[in-house]
Amino acid sequence: MLRLTFMILFSFSFSFSFCTKYFSSSLRLLLEQSPPEISKEGKAKWLRNLITMMERQSLIRLWSSFLYISTLFWMQVHSHSEYLIGLGSYDITGPAADVNMMGYADMAQVASGIHFRLRARTFIVSEPQGKPVVFVNIDACMASQIVTLKVIERLKARYGDLYTEKNVGISGIHTHAGPGGYLQYVVYIVTSLGFVRQSFDALVDGIENSIIQAHENLRPGSIFISNGELLDAGVNRSPSAYLNNPSEERSEYKYDTDKEMTLLKFVDDQWGPVGSFNWFATHGTSMSRTNSLISGDNKGAAARLMEDWFEQREELISDEIPRRVSSIIRNHQDSHEELLELASYFESQPGRAATRVSSSARRVRSPLRKADKPGFVSAFCQTNCGDVSPNVLGAFCLDTGLPCDFNHSTCGGRNELCYGRGPGYPDEFESTRVIGERQFKKALDLFNKASEELQGKVDYRQVYVDFSQLNVTLTKKDGSSEVVRTCPAAMGFAFAAGTTDGPGAFDFTQGDDKGNPFWRMVRNALKTPHKKQMDCHYPKPILLDTGEMTKPYAWAPSILSLQILRIGKLFILSVPGEFTTMAGRRLRDAVKTQLKSSGDKELSGGEIHVVIAGLANGYSQYVTTFEEYQVQRYEGASTLFGPHTLTGYIQEFKKLSKYLVLGRTVQPGPQPPNLLDKQVSFLTPVVMDSTPGGDSFGDVISDVPKNLSVKRGSDLVAVVFQSACPRNDLLTEGTFALVERLEREDKSWTPVYDDDDLCLRFKWSRPKRFSSRSQATIEWRIPESASPGVYRITHFGAAKRLFGSVQHFTGSSSAFVVT
């Protein structure tokens, strides 16, 4: 007890300078609440309770620091673990209606429901008496500079300087099926009709809350790392550009995409495994540009499979991949006739009023029903996926069925009919599941095999670099050097051609290094690039001179964040773009070589692990090699800062890694702009919702047939409800759709599937574009693992009255039988 008291008082004295006037009252409260004897198991819970009381007295920053420091001291005394680890997860789904999706830049692709939900997943790692590193993986197309700035602002308000832009990395999985409008530069929000505040807020709130969870879960633990090959989850979609790399370089690699997955396994000293994060290169484009349901695509699906597997692994003993099954359901051996008779007593319930918490409380994975131990967190992170497609069957012409042109990805000279095919072709949902399942299987294998424990320093370095005018030193083959410069951002003609994952429109083609007079005329109406800019980007013909377009505000970024997070011999390179396969290899190899020659004793023996976290802390499109850039396929045309962009990245990351291992301070560099106050939006708000006369919100429009009996693994059940716009309430950490199973004993309904399950789809629609009426269709594709019994489908929503008040509602279908 004396040792514990000493540590608490020492920790408190560290925080004393922040809030001297609270010292007496806070110390008294601490002594009053301190139990006479604290067990090892109870210490974390007691501290969390204590911190909650302190927050109620407006001491959030003081006592959050106190909690963190006290935990560090406890770790020193009671644990032999190398690190403190904490994981967190939070809903970032955002608006499921009316908002353009980010990724394909197709104005017709507007959200109208949910395939499954999006999440922010976080890990925090720290040494005793050291600052932590934070990594957040978000189910979004990419990280956003303005989102990152806002998250850091909030973290500083809560924790002081504990979490800053230097040690917090935020990376996107690159799904093309999430709400857009959350980036701050004009070119990325044109198709979303400007800035979408709901998308932005959902991301900022979710990222912040996932970090808060991880911080509150900080406990002694260990980290293990594992690597392995996954061969069937990605193909190179620009092989002609890859082949332009030097043959001697290509000969060093077996494949034209990176096949290695790197996985971290987090093990709590008391709770055992609590999470895993892995990095693997494949695009989030299993879902096509015709899809309108919010989805985490293949990486989000893999994360859902992994998290559900872990939560169910003790209940389910099977060699097959588990599906979502509620562990509290008991399988009664009722006859089919008995089940039908039982179901007949439960007809559809009319729509009725509900509360906001109704949806959250009924969620299958509701935190309201969790035990003391936090849920398992598994993230499938993005890396150098720039030229890697999940559509592994190849690209074919829609009209002829023949392979597309190799060099230009065209069909009869045009790009619009050339599409890549996923393994579930023509079903994009099946392709998403299959590619996700393949990543899940490999991650599970690596998770079970992970035996190399990470040990050593936790550190970080971060810098802002102006890539519009960066001096880059090139080393020639003869040993001489030349200084060149990067360019202000610009996009080439082939950018508008799109890719085989999502072709563009009009007569643009990949591999175009000339352009054409008509589109030059259109370009010049916006901004005519000057000769110096055209020479700098050569051989890219400039279609949009975005780096020099500033009205109504900047069209493209110029100042980018580069960051390295270190955990022992693992180095995470946070890059604000999509590196191609070979570009990523060159960056990793350059940093690894720099680290090996640093003289750091920790790095002298064993393997150094270097992973690239793509689309991190901001977004600046693609990064190709110099040789790939010459071909001017989509990726080269989208390399914003010219042919020497990659060399600039390598130069700056070598500097960062040198400063990191030598313990030197890095100058922060020029600060990026905060354009939040300049944002404009043309997305119309929800005015009101209505129903036909006599109907209520939540009423069933199309019910299940009477005496319906369906089979597991093959049948689909669909119910249509009177609904309202999902933008009225995003139901964050809730659900719009629910499948419930009847408990025979007490006639209660148990939630078994919700809108975060791959088998359940929530589809929302209006009869006309500006109609105040809408309906929700909930489709349940009954999985093989569903238990036989009596089921019903329930819908939750929120309706807006003419004068702004929002009323929550719910409704349920008639019961039916699953056999």
Kindly label every feature range from the protein language model.
Residues 9, 25-26, 35, 333, ...:
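Intrinsically disordered, low-complexity proline-rich regions
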Residues 55, 68, 73-819:
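Non-catalytic substrate/cofactor recognition surfaces at enzyme active-site rims
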Residues 16, 27-28, 32-40:
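Short, low-complexity, intrinsically disordered N-terminal modules
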Residues 2-4, 9, 27-31, 47-50, ...:
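Leucine-biased recognition of intrinsically disordered, low-complexity hydrophobic segments
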Residues 3-15, 60-77:
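Cleavable N-terminal signal peptides of Sec/SRP-targeted secreted and luminal proteins
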Residues 38-52:
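Short, Lys/Arg-enriched N-terminal segments with co-localized hydrophobic residues
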